[in-house]
A protein has these predicted regions:
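Phosphate-centric recognition/catalysis
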Residues: 123
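Surface-exposed interaction regions that form or flank ligand-binding interfaces
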Residues: 1-120, 128, 132, 141-146, ...
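Activation of the activation-loop gatekeeper triad in protein kinase-fold domains
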Residues: 138
Length: 256
């Protein structure tokens, strides 16, 4: 597992942090036309008021242009700010869970963060003699509910929130992550290893109706470590080292 110094793995939430920075750039780009038009409008009005000859029509035109650009910029920035807020909440969740997962690291348990897989990324991956896990974290604002009522109900591979809405997109994402890693491991080792699909719902009460954790672990942030500790040893250490090294080679990237 020793790697060259000019390579580094992703850190917790790196993809989300990059998205936040990109959205910040888009906010500036949205403001730029308004700022330029504002400066031009002030300049033209100063001219119209007596410094240099200019028509009233030009001043009015620039003012209208400023209003149009400002309204468009306001609408776009409002949307971007919502996205930034959601990404920051997700980033906080990823880092919070990632810090807890790091405590599980050992000579037989390897924790990876922000594994980029083309169109999507996996928040965390654990490669261990106790099993292989893809982990997706959700840090959502939870609606008010009765004390004994679950925030999420998991049954027969389906996840339903407390308002009765089926979380099919989330389950599809969790399934896709596990299937992707299973395929990659098979590609690297020419063997098939089962992967647990984990969804960590931060601060939520999740009711697993069937008590079936053979494939999916839809649990809250306080439960994962306990579930993991109770798992029996499944894979030889040499297999784990080989898979972990292959994954590290896949996710590492050069430092510019």
């Amino acid at each position: 597992m020793n790697r060259k110094q000019h390579f580094r793995p992703h850190v917790q939430g790196e993809s989300l942090e990059n998205k936040i920075n990109q959205l910040g750039d888009e906010v500036f780009e949205a403001l730029l036309p308004s700022m330029v038009t504002f400066a031009a409008s002030v300049f033209i009005w100063m001219i119209y008021l007596g410094f240099l000859p200019v028509s009233l029509l030009s001043a009015v035109f620039m003012t209208i242009l400023l209003v149009v650009f400002s309204v468009r910029a306001f609408a776009k920035i409002r949307k971007l700010n919502r996205q930034i807020k959601n990404h920051r909440k997700g980033l906080d969740g990823e880092r919070y869970v990632g810090t807890k997962l790091e405590r599980l690291s050992s000579n037989s348990t390897f924790v990876f963060h922000d594994v980029v897989c083309g169109k999507f990324n996996i928040d965390h991956v654990i490669i261990s003699t106790k099993g292989i896990f893809t982990i997706d974290t959700k840090n959502r604002a939870l609606p008010d509910r009765d004390y004994n009522k679950a925030d999420f109900i998991f049954k027969d591979g389906e996840l339903i929130d407390s308002t009765g809405v089926l979380q099919s997109d989330l389950m599809h994402k969790i399934e896709s992550q596990g299937r992707w890693l299973e395929g990659k491991i098979n590609e690297w080792t020419k063997k098939r290893y089962p992967v647990y699909r984990v969804g960590i719902m931060i601060g939520a009460y999740v009711n697993n109706i069937n008590k079936d954790f053979s494939k999916y672990w839809i649990i809250n942030d306080g439960a994962f470590a306990g579930f993991f500790d109770k798992e029996r040893e499944k894979f030889p250490l040499n297999d784990v080292l080989r898979i972990a090294d292959s994954l590290q080679r896949f996710i590492e990237k050069p430092i510019a």
